[in-house]
A protein has these predicted regions:
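Short, low-complexity, charged/polar segments at coil/turn and helix-coil boundaries
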Residues: 4-93
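Short, cysteine-centered beta-strand-loop-beta hairpins and adjacent loop/turn segments enriched
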Residues: 94-98
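Protruding loop/beta-arch "assembly-hinge" segments enriched in small, turn-prone residues
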Residues: 99-121
Length: 121
């Protein structure tokens, strides 16, 4: 074994670990946000859209009271280290809910999960 091959193996291992760590953090953040979304009909929770490189536009017809389907869709779209990941909810009332418009989530959805992730990382 050469020094070069040792370095290559190390770089692959570190790269994979870093990629998995970044992806895992993003999954926790996005999942927490989705599950913190207050539920009436499930439309708000079902309208979270994950994407890479650019925020998703428009809304969906998805309704997801449990949140599992929305999380599964988000997980499939999340990239690892070096990726720019977005989670957006384009429903017209999502911003109102984020800033105190719901008794179920008076502190919002995104902000509380962002703060939670910052404490962990």
């Amino acid at each position: 074994m050469s020094f070069e091959s040792d370095l290559e193996r190390f770089a692959r291992r570190v790269g994979k670990s870093l990629d998995e760590t970044c992806r895992g953090i993003t999954i926790k953040w996005f999942s927490g946000t989705i599950m913190s979304t207050p539920v009436d009909t499930g439309r708000l929770r079902g309208n979270w859209q994950a994407s890479q490189e650019a925020p998703a536009s428009g809304t969906t017809a998805d309704v997801d009271k449990a949140g599992n389907a929305t999380i599964a869709k988000a997980v499939r779209k999340i990239g690892g280290a070096g990726s720019v990941n977005y989670l957006v909810n384009n429903l017209d009332y999502a911003e109102k809910i984020e800033f105190g418009g719901s008794n179920q989530a008076p502190r919002g959805m995104v902000r509380i999960n962002h703060a939670r992730i910052l404490r962990i990382v």
